[in-house]
Amino acid sequence: MHSKSAVLNQSFIAKLAILCLPSLFLLTALGQRKHEPPVVEDFEHRAQQYLDTQKETHVDIKPSGSAAKIDQEKQEARQKIKQARPEAKQGDIFTPAIGNYFREQLAITLQGPDGAKIRASLRHAEPLPNLRLRVNSRYPSNLPLQSTPPTLLANLPYLPGELQYRIVGRTLVLYDVSSGLIADLLPNAISNQNKIKGK
């Protein structure tokens, strides 16, 4: 009898633990967010403000459409976002404080155990000609969209799927995936000390 009761108790405790796991994960995530530096919260807020503006354009880009149709929809989205952000400038999202934080995080990563591999990956990326990128402008369609090693971004704040980090030379670009716009950029994100040889 006692044995059966013990088994039932163990079964109940196991089920209770399973039910509590999602709550524990949620509490852990909330606890981690509480410990985020204010500068990260400021960045996330500014990035979300950009996405809110993007959503207000009400342009639905359908991936299943023809290439010409998708390009037309992207162009329409870019135009509406530009109209909604007529005064947009470098530093609206990457403020000086946020920019310094990002530079520090990138430097930490490049000086870490994966630094050599990251530098090699960037060194082998397709070279870009001297290029002047501007906020609220389209990333030039005739130039390759540089891929960024995931390990380089490990210490950077999380981004929603609509935005991506891109490294162009030594500049960090905040790239709007759906419209192809440059939401903001951070010059000299990679310091001279971490400059990629051959760049």
Task: List each model region and its residues.
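Early exported N-terminus immediately downstream of N-terminal targeting peptides
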Residues: V40-I98
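C-terminal partner/receptor-binding element of secreted or periplasmic proteins
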Residues: L181-K199
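N-terminal post-signal-peptidase region of extra-cytosolic proteins
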Residues: S147-G161
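N-terminal secretory signal peptides that target proteins for export/translocation
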Residues: M1-F12
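Bacterial N-terminal signal peptides
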Residues: K15-L26
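A short, solvent-exposed beta-edge/loop patch
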Residues: L163-V177, L181-I182, I190
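Mid-length scaffold segments of soluble, non-membrane domains
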Residues: E76-S147
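Boundary at the C-terminal end of the N-terminal hydrophobic targeting segment
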Residues: A29-G31
